[in-house]
Amino acid sequence: MLRRVSFAVLLVLAPAGVARAQSLRDQIRTDLFTFGNCGEPLCLAGSLGAHGGHFIPSDTSSSGSMLTLLGTALSQSVSNVPVSATSAGVTYSFVGGLPVKTSTSGGPIFGERAQTLGKGRWFIGANVTAMNFQRLRGIPMNEVTFNFTHADVSPSGPTPNDTLGSPEFENDVVQVKLALNISVLVTTFVASYGLVDGVDLSVAVPVVHTSVQGTSVATIIPFDFPTPHFFAGDATNPVLTAVSGMDGSASGLGDISARLKVNVVQSGDFGVSVLGDARFPTGDENNLLGAGAFSGRGLAIASARFGTITPHLNFGYAFRDAKFANNSILATGGFDNQLSGWATMAFELMSEWELGASKLKIPGVVHYLAPFPHTVTPTNIPDQQDNFLNASMGFKFQTPKGILITTNALFPLRNSGLEPAVVWTSGLEYSF
């Protein structure tokens, strides 16, 4: 058995291919925001002289921030796919050298219960999670809009002018409307082992496939005519609209996690444990396969048993080392109900609450001073904290061979971050 498990892990860890040499983040930046043959995002190939480069993100900090926002939100959402519990099915403790059952139900699906496996026992599982992202902070993925503003250029000469809006062409805006279809398929292999009675060590290895298709429609909104900004044509007959698109995918190893659970208190019907979870940046952030930085969780776990119903509470703290990710408070509550000897229903409310102002910043409103005071809002994406609340409901069915078949649906309840309408999970679990 160990030989087969080792071989499977080696296959998972083998380098996975990427559909294109260019990373998905680069494709989003270049393919969706490059129009014409200029070769740079927001470069206006048809414009006269230096005017073609006045919207390039490297020259306009707010434009660069918006492209960073989109790519970072994508990679963080992919890396936050929930991982199944460290144990499932029947668990044991040893009393007088003999194994005694501490649980008989199938257990929770994503939350943790206090019981551990028991010394020398194994839990292995594999599940597949599928999602299609539908909204970004509540904005539908086919309605995301960016307004890219002109760089504040100072005309040459003896009287330079640093007032934004003067000359008048600085008031021109390039509006880009996106329609994105982003799908993620995660296959996760989990193995847990009872080091001693009351202490479990677990490893979760995800393999991620991310697919991104999108179209973008860019429109130059001139403040006045004639305008020096256009995609094609000339100042007399300017072409002010352009379309671009992308279709890319990537597959590979996600962020591997290692977890250690220690049972502190365990009676017949009540238990308390603590869990430490470390996620390592083994997934390629640029291809939207991982977070690109270390993260860790610490949880306090309490669970009880009332007949066939086993409630559990998890409360803890998440640390994230990524530049644009916040630390957060974690809270999960739920129960599993043994419907029969072979079927268990599980329900959970899972939440995550950011600490401090969100590091994933929306560029601020741009204020113009000329020819009259006015403002431009860079995007319709709200500037807010990303606090998550999800409802999860699923079932576990035990086969005559002792294998658990898991099905689950998770529903986001808040408009935070990049979210799907539903997250589907199915898998197999086995304890021995």
Residue ranges and their predicted role:
Residues 128-134, 205-211, 255, 264, ...:
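Transmembrane beta-strands of outer-membrane beta-barrel pores
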Residues 133, 199-203, 267-271, 308-313, ...:
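Repeated loop/turn-to-beta-strand initiation elements of outer-membrane beta-barrel proteins
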Residues 136-141, 214-220, 274-277, 284-292, ...:
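Outer-membrane beta-barrel translocator domains and adjoining extracellular loop/strand segments
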Residues 143-149, 154-156, 225-242, 325, ...:
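Outer membrane beta-barrel transmembrane domains
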Residues 110-111, 173-177, 242-247, 283-288, ...:
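Extracellular loop and loop/strand-boundary signature of outer-membrane beta-barrel proteins
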Residues 22-204, 208-250, 254, 361, ...:
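A subset of solvent-exposed loop/turn segments in beta-rich extracellular surface proteins, enriched
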Residues 106, 118-120, 182-187, 251-256, ...:
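Residues that define the transmembrane beta-barrel architecture of outer-membrane proteins
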Residues 106, 110-113, 124-128, 189-193, ...:
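Residues on the lipid-exposed face of transmembrane beta-strands in outer-membrane beta-barrel proteins
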